[in-house]
């Protein structure tokens, strides 16, 4: 068995996100305890993790320096939450996106942890001020929001509660770096955090352009996959601005008026009408039929592409 000297991490919830976190922490040499209220869920999760990690090994994409068997030896299931958190340095909550359910879990954890363990949520949209309200250990609470699928997309948004201690943010940031993720700090909470605010802005305008007959759904997706997305896989929108002129100030001097003119033509928030949804769905189903088999195959293809992109990015060092 591999050494677990790196520390012990508890995963609360054994769904897709929970399993991904378990694999990531094991890749960093951490002992991982997977907790779920259903023993069968834990067994299923451990079997899925074993299969997934074996496939990653075969593809040469297993993270970390430990072998697949060493990593698997670090992951175990535990149906008792009090036993699971004993000796833990970090607890990552991964239950369904339901505020009351998550609050119940955190209240339970709050009553049994010490003053050293970090309580972290994987929520994609729930505000820390609501999620951690009233907890005794609120200074130890933080949101660490991964991007799906977390094993292939390294970004993690760190969002503190207004009373979260700076050391909690620093420790979580260091932990994410240690397991190969790319943490970024959200300085203060905002609805949707940062990633989803940007994503929803794109979805909003994409929907409007399709709804108004300006572009077909399939051509809209090409704009991202064969255009913006290729740049954004390596540099963000602000660096793109910086490079597309003689620096940021030059870009703003040249293009800000034109940008403002176009932005003024943007309409209100789309209603996401049924008629447009059916139009988009018809176009999407021509590419990927919406039955479980085709969707699963396409997701697997997506993950394989992300795996290859991650490999490429690891080989391309910034100048």
Curated annotation (Swiss-Prot):
Top-level taxonomic group: Eukaryota
EC number(s) per entry: 1.1.1.45
Record text on activity regulation: Inhibited by malonate.
GO MF terms, alphabetically ordered: L-gulonate 3-dehydrogenase activity; NAD+ binding; protein homodimerization activity
Binding-site list for NAD(+): 16-17, 36, 97, 102
Cellular component, GO annotation: cytosol; extracellular exosome
Catalytic activity: L-gulonate + NAD(+) = 3-dehydro-L-gulonate + NADH + H(+)
Main location per the UniProt record: cytoplasm
UniProt keyword terms in alphabetical order: Acetylation, Cytoplasm, NAD, Oxidoreductase, Phosphoprotein
Phosphoserine found at: 3, 111
Protein localization: Cytoplasm
Signal sequence region: none
Gene3D superfamilies: N-(1-d-carboxylethyl)-l-norvaline Dehydrogenase, domain 2, NAD(P)-binding Rossmann-like Domain
Protein name (database record): Lambda-crystallin homolog
Source organism (scientific name): Homo sapiens
């Amino acid at each position: 068995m591999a050494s677990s000297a790196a520390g012990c991490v508890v995963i609360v919830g054994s769904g897709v996100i929970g399993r991904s976190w378990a694999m990531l922490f094991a890749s960093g040499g951490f002992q991982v305890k997977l907790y779920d209220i259903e023993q069968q869920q834990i067994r299923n999760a451990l079997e899925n993790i074993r299969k997934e990690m074996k496939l990653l090994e075969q593809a040469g994409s297993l993270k970390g320096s430990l072998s697949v068997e060493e990593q698997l030896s670090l992951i175990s299931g535990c149906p008792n939450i009090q036993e699971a958190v004993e000796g833990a340095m970090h607890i990552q909550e991964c239950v369904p996106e339901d505020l009351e359910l998550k609050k119940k879990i955190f209240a339970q954890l709050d009553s049994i942890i010490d003053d050293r363990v970090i309580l972290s949520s994987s929520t994609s949209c729930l505000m820390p001020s609501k999620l951690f309200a009233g907890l005794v250990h609120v200074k130890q609470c933080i949101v660490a929001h991964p991007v799906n699928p977390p094993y292939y997309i390294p970004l993690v948004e760190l969002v503190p509660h207004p009373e979260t201690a700076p050391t909690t943010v620093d420790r979580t940031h260091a932990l994410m770096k240690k397991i190969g993720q790319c943490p970024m700090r959200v300085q203060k909470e905002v609805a949707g955090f940062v990633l989803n605010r940007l994503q929803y802005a794109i979805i909003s305008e994409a929907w409007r352009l399709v709804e108004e007959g300006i572009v077909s759904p399939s051509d809209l997706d090409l704009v991202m996959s064969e255009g913006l997305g290729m740049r954004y896989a390596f540099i963000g929108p602000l660096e793109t601005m910086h490079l597309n002129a003689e620096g940021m100030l030059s870009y703003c001097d040249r293009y800000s008026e034109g940008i403002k003119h176009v932005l003024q033509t943007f309409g209100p928030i789309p209603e996401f009408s049924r008629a447009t949804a059916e139009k988009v769905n018809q176009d999407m189903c021509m590419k990927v039929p919406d039955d479980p088999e085709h969707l699963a195959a396409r997701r697997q293809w997506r993950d394989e592409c992300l795996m290859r992109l991650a490999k490429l990015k690891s080989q391309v060092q910034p100048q």
